[in-house]
Amino acid sequence: MLIAVLAVAIVAVPVVRWAAARDTTGRRVDGGRLPVVLVPGYGGSRASLEQLRATLVRRGIQARTIAVPGNGTGDLRASARALATAVERTGPGPVDLIGYSAGGVVARIYLGELGGAARVRHVVLLGAPNHGTKVAELAVQFRAAECAVACTQLAPGSALLDAINGDETPDGPDYLSLWTAKDETVTPPDTARLDGAYNVELQSICPDAATTHGELPRDRLVTGLVLRALDGGTLEGLGEGDCATLRAAA
């Protein structure tokens, strides 16, 4: 049961970099928009990110969701290498990254171990198990034979997570980590919190948000926050009065 949940569903203090409007927006020197590379989660389903990707494209942003090896259940470092290849294919300039669920961990491996921090402007993580998830921990304990490589790597205290959490936000990009208090897969939900990132629980802005883990990439509030972040807009001071505007932006 635990493995089924994992395979289906996993497909602090804010820093000032996103606390105020910035000159470092999601645009190239020539005024064009930076390409966005999206990284799917455990299970590797690109369909889970299609609505968000299509929204970005409608706004004139070149957006691509990568295919990860091993259906997203294999070695997350191999997925990070696939991400590095995808970024190189966008050309020599900077890019923005969006990592959903385990895809957020893949993005962080690329940033911290493969030199990606030098190429990336904005990093947006959606429900990322940055410090592991209890679901994976239980799977390792009780269903080890069914727990794929990525599953073991997502257990709290894994060697991989310990390695990338030595420096949770390597210098270079701006980091935004979003999560929902209603997350039933990445538990506890605030395992998504990162030192040096702008950390946002959806319900801290919109208490009525009932977004689950699987709904994060399709949620209108999440999309509104992602769009604002990629534009380099301020996220400080957002509250319940901004919910309608954020959702309408999607």
What are these regions, as identified by a protein language model?
Residues 1-38, 43-55, 61-64, 239-250:
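Flexible, membrane-associating and regulatory peripheral segments of lipid-active enzymes
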Residues 34-40, 47, 51, 55-67, ...:
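Serine-dependent carboxylesterase/thioesterase catalytic core
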Residues 112-250:
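Helical cap/lid subdomain of alpha/beta-hydrolase-fold lipid enzymes
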